[in-house]
Every structure is written in structure tokens, then in C-alpha cells.
């Protein structure tokens, strides 16, 4: 009898994995909307891939595998499996990260194409989006295995340029999310101040605004100290000075009387967040300057005693501070994409989302009280399925560039830092500032449109 009950329990779990609606772990999620849970589960797939990439980049993993003669082949072949052994050089390091991230991007791109023009959960494709997680996992694993059988050839070099473009776009998405976050934060605290008739909320906004600007000024000083030299590093000096000037200009525009009249919720908090993010992107750009005099991280990667030489003679490296901070920012932004519920109309338009609290009938209220997922998209989807998966495609290529520190695979299998990475990040910072400036002046330039 116990065995039968256990089998029934397993079949119940299997139905959750293979069915058209998620139910595992839903009791742990307050207000379990299908729209939110599905995004979270897809994000888990992304984080699993990132975890595999981190393991593949670990400097101790490859050396330990080579101690097992029955596992690794010490040759330099381009295939993964050779005469019953594994070419560990293909399974580890930057080449492996390229393949793993290619698999993730292909997986999410497949769903992006599949979910085009899904308008509500009544579309049969919505059941695929919100369920069948076991089969999705099998597809994910299958694509990953296939990616490791791609011959070396020019794959890494071609995929590098895909990563450059995708990462540029994702940097802009991160900035849009920060605009959304800062706007929501500012609006909620202002509402709290009016409701409670307390100046503590205003003091809190002032404190964090001052903190973010102080961090930005500190970042500028540190960038000048560590990434410039007297009589050299002119590009870095121009980038730092120009971005600082642009941030000051944007901050002034944010508090102009006409801007305040058109957008009462705009202010220095949002501008301070954007300024800090711009300094962060500037730091990422300068960490890729291919000049040892102007880039201390380049010395770390290629200095004496700090480079790990693989069995094929190419050089690998472990992460530096920009890579670690970039990974943390990536994780936070990806989670925010999955959980965001925004009331910023301009950001919603750019992000193709319009998250509205659903009106629950009696049956749905009972489902919520029981801790199960319920369908809140019968009358219309709360976000664009296809665009969400496209964001995860961009996230996949961005994390590939972050983990490999934007180094381009060279003919000698060394990872080479190039000016391409520098200019892409600097241009992303300029484009991001222009996007934020547009959110400020759009109501003035287009008075006939509703930006409320």
C-alpha cells in the first residue's frame, strides 16, 4: 500500500513537470500567477547554465580532470570525444563557455520564435510557455550536448561578434530596468510621505540620492587613479571626463522646472542611479583597454605567476573585480526581469510589458488561498512571451561576454583583449544616457501623447 501511495505521489509530481501548468513549489510563492512563475522557471534554466559556465571556468577543475587518465585526452583535437577519451580543453575554459552560452541562447531563441503573437492563455502555445518543464529540460540538455560537438573552426570568432552585439543591447536593457526601478522607488516613497505626512521618507530619498552621487564621484576618482597615467591613457581620460560631463548635464535636466511640471515624479534619485550605472559601465570599458599601462587588470591576466597555462599552451584566467561585479548586476537584473511589475509607461513600452494586477473571481481566489498557480492571462498576456525570451537570449550572450571578460579568441587560442569591447561599452553608456534623457523630455516634445 505504501509503495502504491508513493507511486501515486510521484505521478502527481510528474504531472506537474509534464502538464500544462506549474504546481511544484507554488505553495512557497505568494500570489502564484502563471505569468510570474513561468518567468521564474525560465530564469532558473538560465542560472543553471551560468552555474555550469562558472564551474567550467574554475582554474582547479581542469587540472583535476587531467589527473584522471581515463577521463581526459591530452591531445589537441577539435572533437569532444577522441578514442573513448574526452578532450577536456573543449569541455572547459572559454571555449566551453562559448558553447554553453550558445546552447542557452539557442534554447531561448527557439521559444521566442514559438511564442510570437501569443495574445492570451487561450492560445494553445501558452500551455507550452507555462508548463511541460520536464520536456523543456530535456530539450535544454539536448541542445547543450549538441553545442559541444560543434567543430572549433571559426565558431568562437563568429560567436564573439554575436556576443558583442547582444551584450550591447542587454546593457541598454539593464539601464531601462534601472530607470524603471528608480522611478518606482521614488514614486512609492513620495506616496508614503504624503500618506504618512512624515518627512522621514523625504530624508530617505535625499540620503540615497546623496549616497549614489558620492559613490559616483568616488568611482570617477578611482578610475583616474588606476586607469590613467600622466602623459598617457588619453582615451581613458576622455571617456571618464566625457561621461562625467554627460551625467552632470542629465542630472541638471532632470530638475528643470518644465521637466518637473511634465513629470512630477522625476528627480535626482533616478539621475543619481543612472549616473552610478554609467560610471559602472565606464569601469567595465576601461577594464578591457588592451594597454598594460592603462589597465591594471591586464597585468593580472598576463603577469608573471598569475596566468594558468592549459595543456594546449593557451592562457586562461580567473575572474577579476569587474567580472564579479558584472555577474552580480546581471543576476539582479535578470531576477528583476522575471518579477517586475511596473507602472512606468515609457519603460513598459520599450520593454514590451504591461503588468496589471488581475481581477480574481471566486475560483481563482480559492486557488490562491490553496497556494497553487492560477491563470491570470485569460483576457490577455501580462507580458510579451516572445520578447521575454529574446531578453533571455541577450542575457545568455551577455553573461558569455562577462565571464570571458570580453576577450576575443585568438589564433593561438589565447584570449585577447581588444578595443572593440571598450568602444561597445562606451557607446552603450552614451546610448543609455540618451534613452534616459528621452524619458525626461518626451512629454515636452510630444505633448499630444499620453505619458502619464
From Swiss-Prot:
One of its GO terms (biological process) is plasma membrane phospholipid scrambling. GO terms for cellular component: membrane; plasma membrane. It is found in: Cell membrane. It catalyses: a 1,2-diacyl-sn-glycero-3-phospho-L-serine(in) = a 1,2-diacyl-sn-glycero-3-phospho-L-serine(out); a 1,2-diacyl-sn-glycero-3-phosphocholine(in) = a 1,2-diacyl-sn-glycero-3-phosphocholine(out); a 1,2-diacyl-sn-glycero-3-phosphoethanolamine(in) = a 1,2-diacyl-sn-glycero-3-phosphoethanolamine(out). It comes from the Eukaryota. InterPro entries: TDE1/TMS. The keyword RNA-binding does not apply. Keywords: Cell membrane, Membrane, Transmembrane, Transmembrane helix. It is a multi-pass membrane protein. The chain crosses the membrane at residues 5-25, 41-61, 96-116, 131-151, 158-178, 205-225, 236-256, 266-286, 319-339, 387-407, 426-446. Belongs to the TDE1 family. Non-ATP-dependent, non-specific lipid transporter for phosphatidylserine, phosphatidylcholine, and phosphatidylethanolamine. Functions as a scramblase that flips lipids in both directions across the membrane. In contrast to SERINC3 and SERINC5, has no effect on gammaretrovirus particles infectivity. This is Serine incorporator 2. It comes from Bos taurus (Bovine).
Amino acid at each position: 500500500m505504501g509503495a502504491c501511495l508513493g507511486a501515486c505521489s510521484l505521478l502527481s509530481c510528474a504531472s506537474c513537470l509534464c502538464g500544462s501548468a506549474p504546481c511544484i513549489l507554488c505553495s512557497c510563492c505568494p500570489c502564484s500567477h502563471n505569468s510570474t512563475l513561468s518567468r521564474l522557471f525560465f530564469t532558473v534554466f538560465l542560472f543553471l547554465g551560468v552555474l555550469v559556465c562558472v564551474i567550467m571556468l574554475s582554474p582547479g577543475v581542469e587540472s583535476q580532470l587531467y589527473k584522471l587518465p581515463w577521463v581526459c585526452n591530452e591531445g589537441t583535437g577539435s572533437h569532444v570525444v577522441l578514442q573513448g577519451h574526452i578532450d577536456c580543453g573543449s569541455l572547459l575554459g572559454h571555449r566551453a563557455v562559448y558553447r554553453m552560452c550558445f546552447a542557452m541562447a539557442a534554447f531561448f531563441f527557439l521559444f521566442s520564435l514559438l511564442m510570437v503573437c501569443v495574445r492570451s492563455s487561450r492560445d494553445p502555445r501558452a500551455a507550452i510557455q507555462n508548463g511541460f518543464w520536464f520536456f523543456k529540460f530535456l530539450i535544454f540538455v539536448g541542445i547543450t550536448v549538441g553545442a559541444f560537438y560543434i567543430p572549433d573552426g571559426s565558431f568562437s570568432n563568429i560567436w564573439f561578434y554575436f556576443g558583442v552585439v547582444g551584450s550591447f543591447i542587454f546593457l541598454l536593457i539593464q539601464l531601462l530596468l534601472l530607470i524603471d526601478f528608480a522611478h518606482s522607488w521614488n514614486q512609492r516613497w513620495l506616496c508614503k510621505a504624503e500618506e504618512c505626512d512624515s518627512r522621514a521618507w523625504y530624508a530617505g530619498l535625499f540620503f540615497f540620492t546623496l549616497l549614489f552621487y558620492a559613490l559616483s564621484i568616488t568611482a570617477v576618482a578611482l578610475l583616474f587613479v588606476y586607469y590613467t597615467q600622466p602623459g598617457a591613457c588619453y582615451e581613458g581620460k576622455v571617456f571618464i571626463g566625457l561621461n562625467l560631463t554627460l551625467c552632470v548635464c542629465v542630472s541638471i535636466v532632470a530638475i528643470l522646472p518644465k521637466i518637473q511640471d511634465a513629470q512630477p515624479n522625476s528627480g535626482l534619485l533616478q539621475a543619481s542611479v543612472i549616473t552610478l550605472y554609467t560610471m559602472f559601465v565606464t569601469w567595465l570599458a576601461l577594464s578591457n583597454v588592451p594597454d598594460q599601462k592603462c589597465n591594471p587588470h591586464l597585468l593580472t591576466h598576463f603577469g608573471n605567476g598569475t596566468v594558468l597555462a592549459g595543456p594546449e599552451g593557451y592562457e586562461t584566467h580567473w575572474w577579476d573585480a569587474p567580472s564579479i561585479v558584472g555577474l552580480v548586476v546581471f543576476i539582479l537584473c535578470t531576477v528583476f526581469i522575471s518579477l517586475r511589475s511596473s507602472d512606468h509607461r515609457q519603460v513598459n513600452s520599450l520593454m514590451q510589458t504591461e503588468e496589471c494586477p488581475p481581477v480574481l473571481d471566486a475560483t481563482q481566489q480559492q486557488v490562491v488561498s490553496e497556494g497553487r498557480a492560477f491563470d491570470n492571462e485569460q483576457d490577455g498576456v501580462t507580458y510579451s512571451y516572445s520578447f521575454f525570451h529574446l531578453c533571455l537570449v541577450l542575457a545568455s550572450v551577455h553573461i558569455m561576454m562577462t565571464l570571458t571578460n570580453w576577450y576575443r579568441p585568438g589564433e593561438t587560442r589565447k584570449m585577447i583583449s581588444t578595443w572593440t569591447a571598450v568602444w561597445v561599452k562606451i557607446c552603450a553608456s552614451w546610448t543609455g544616457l540618451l534613452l534616459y534623457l528621452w524619458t525626461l523630455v518626451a512629454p515636452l516634445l510630444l505633448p499630444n501623447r499620453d505619458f502619464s
